[in-house]
A protein has these predicted regions:
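Helix-to-loop junction immediately C-terminal to a conserved catalytic motif
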Residues: 52
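Catalytic Walker B motif of ABC-type/P-loop ATPase nucleotide-binding domains
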Residues: 163-167
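The feature captures the beta-strand-to-loop junction immediately N-terminal to the Walker
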Residues: 37-39
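Conserved ABC transporter NBD signature motif
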Residues: 60-68
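Conserved ABC ATPase signature
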Residues: 113, 138-142, 146
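Conserved structural motif at the start of ABC-family nucleotide-binding domains
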Residues: 6, 21-23
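Conserved ABC ATPase "signature" region
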Residues: 101, 116-134, 159
Length: 168
């Protein structure tokens, strides 16, 4: 039996006990790009949150590297999968570099102390996302488009196998 990087089996998604969609079958191979297209309210964001483990499935299974997503610890899941949502809470007195560096938390331990390699991973991710010039700027004082680039950098520097991007 072939294992996919990410797979769903008879997945049902939604909030509470009301499914937005059910019977979802998705399979993704390494390097593959999948795009979800649909109208507002169709459940695209809900599906991404369920794939990331932020929402529990209402039915079915999410597999990551052939293993049920619920079997992963939060840290192990974060090392394999990153979710970028379009809106995030504003933080006080946080530079864009520091905000992006939160993507390294799965690797830094509880104290969150960045090694030189972690700092380089953050810098590289900011460059890939076109946000290196924002590194020293306050995250609250940049445009929405710039904020999206920093959010993307945070997801990239997490170095996951799976990137889930909601309205990148």
């Amino acid at each position: 039996m072939r294992e996919f990087l990410c797979e769903t089996q008879e997945l049902a998604i939604g909030y509470g006990k009301t499914p937005l969609a059910s019977g979802i079958a998705l399979r993704a191979n390494p390097g593959q790009i999948l795009v979800l297209v649909g109208p507002n309210g169709a459940g695209k964001s809900t599906l991404l949150k369920t794939l990331a483990g932020q929402l529990a499935p209402l039915g079915g299974t999410v597999l990551l590297d052939g293993q049920d997503l619920t079997a992963y610890t939060g840290t192990a899941r974060a090392q394999k999968l990153a979710l970028m949502l379009p809106h995030t809470r504003r933080t006080e007195l946080t530079t864009c570099f520091e905000f992006a560096a939160a993507g390294r938390i799965p690797y830094t331990g509880r104290l969150g102390i960045l090694s030189d390699a972690d700092r380089q991973a953050v810098q590289d991710a900011l460059e890939i996302a076109g946000a290196a010039h924002l590194a020293d700027r306050d995250f609250n004082c940049i445009s929405d488009g710039q904020r999206q680039r920093v959010l993307l950098a945070r997801a990239i520097c997490q170095q996951p196998k799976v990137l889930l991007l909601d309205e990148p």
